[in-house]
Regions:
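N-terminal leader/signal peptides at the extreme start of proteins
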Residues: 1-34
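Asp/Glu-centered strand-loop micro-motifs enriched in Gly/Pro and often flanked by an aromatic residue
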Residues: 3, 33-35, 167-168, 174
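Generic detector of low-complexity/intrinsically disordered segments
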Residues: 18, 28-29, 38, 42, ...
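Terminal low-complexity, poorly structured segments
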Residues: 22-23, 32-36, 49, 109, ...
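Acidic/proline-rich low-complexity IDRs
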Residues: 24-26, 35-39, 52, 99, ...
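N-terminal single-pass transmembrane signal-anchor helix
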Residues: 31-60, 65, 69
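N-terminal pilin/flagellin-like segments and related low-complexity appendage regions
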Residues: 70-265
Length: 265
């Protein structure tokens, strides 16, 4: 061995770091899986996220249904306005009984789609089963046959607008064949500017045949029955509501007048 090689070997022997260069140190192996503390931390984070997201998702779903219901009100109102443009007056729906000034009037839910439904028949020109309107054309109120004398179809109600007769949903069995909003609510008020003065007014002096505003209930309660207050629906002396047609209903969980969904608000 040459002196230079011997010197290099001697230096490597004297320098253990150089001798071990290139050899990776062995790291202690980490146990597989999570520790109890890590699992509890993850569970806590999931709980916090769920508490944030679930109410947000529910609120978003409710807001979407409210928007859809407003869209329904707009379509129904447009059909009624088309009727007025065709005949020169607004149609008359129910004028007495529990269904006074209601979309479904006094029509009971069920499988008999030939039973008179004034709102549907007047705007569609047929019965709910598609058969032709028959019977008297005069009366009080005037039957649909005497109002839509040309049998013009002003609107086409879809399944989203009506509870199917074939439904097996126990909460909807008593509402079969009735018009509904996006919350499956069938208790919906409808008011029109009967005297064509540009606004809808209630009271005996209002001129629109609306003595009092109809009370409506949410689909999940029969004990809550409310109508708009005078802030939302001004009295006749205050000018009423500037509109030709208005609708309102109470969404689920509604308990006060501020919860009402009103087409003009």
């Amino acid at each position: 061995m040459t002196s230079s090689n011997a010197g290099a070997a001697s230096r490597r022997a004297e320098n253990p770091r150089a001798r071990n260069r290139g050899v990776k140190p062995l790291l202690p192996r980490r146990p597989c899986g999570f520790t109890l503390i890590e699992l509890l931390t993850v569970i806590a984070i999931i709980g916090i996220l769920a508490a944030i997201l679930i109410p947000t998702t529910s609120s978003a779903r409710t807001a979407a249904k409210k928007a859809k219901t407003r869209g329904q009100f707009a379509q129904w109102g447009a059909a009624i306005e088309s009727f007025r443009q065709e005949y020169g007056y607004y149609p008359t729906f129910e004028i007495s009984g529990a269904g006074l000034n209601k979309v479904n009037g006094n029509t009971a839910g069920g499988t008999n789609l030939t039973a008179v439904h004034r709102f549907y028949e007047t705007l569609v020109g047929t019965r709910r089963d598609g058969s032709a309107l028959t019977g008297a054309a005069t009366g009080n109120p005037v039957p649909p046959l005497g109002q839509n004398t040309k049998r013009i179809q002003f609107i086409s109600f879809t399944e989203a607008d009506m509870v199917p007769v074939s439904t097996t949903d126990s909460s909807l069995l008593t509402k079969r064949g009735l018009i509904r909003d996006s919350f499956d609510n069938t208790d919906i008020a409808v008011l029109v500017d009967r005297n064509l003065d540009g606004s809808i007014k209630f009271s005996a002096q209002g001129g629109d045949g609306i003595n009092t505003l109809p009370l409506v209930s949410p689909p999940d309660s029969t004990t809550v029955r409310l109508a708009p207050n005078t802030t939302d629906f001004p009295t006749a002396t205050q000018g009423g509501v500037r509109a030709g047609v208005v609708f309102y209903c109470m969404p689920p969980n509604g308990t006060s007048q501020t919860d009402l969904l009103m087409s003009w608000k």
